[in-house]
């Protein structure tokens, strides 16, 4: 059985993050090993949420797994609670990613033109380091703009989105997938780019 490590928060309410990743990955007959980055009372769109940062647990977990010769077919990252966690995740990659381990990065930090509550304007710069290590990076449009220094706007045409994807690819990932792309009224899809082949793929 293949094994995937999912590094992201546990939101006690809100249908997201590890509470979604664990059952979905498990339903695909893949073992999902979880690495909680924080425990939140709700996801960050609820006002007044409370959070317990688990930064000090990430590397001890990684070191213990390594001592047990744990192998991972993939490592997926989602919500990282602080700049420190972006550094810890990169060290997690160094400890546990083998030559065939897929690194899948969702730079979950923003939506609707704004950073999530609790993140300062410098946070995208830290997240770039994680994205640079990815084999596959899957930001939404807001996150892609923040990562590439592109001014956010409400409407985008295909040439502009492709330009953003090219800028994302320059950060280092082998494949970039833009999520939440508006293809029409009430219709969202994805736009992907593989820089090695200079090839785009649309679904929506």
PLM feature spans:
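Conserved phosphate/ATP/ADP-binding segment of small-molecule kinases
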Residues: 117-198
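Short, surface-exposed, charge-dense and proline/glycine-enriched linear segments
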Residues: 63-72, 101-110, 133-137, 168-178, ...
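Short pre-catalytic strand/loop immediately N-terminal to key active-site residues, enriched for Gly-Thr
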Residues: 12-13, 199-204
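Conserved N-terminal subdomain of the carbohydrate kinase-like
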Residues: 1-105, 109-117
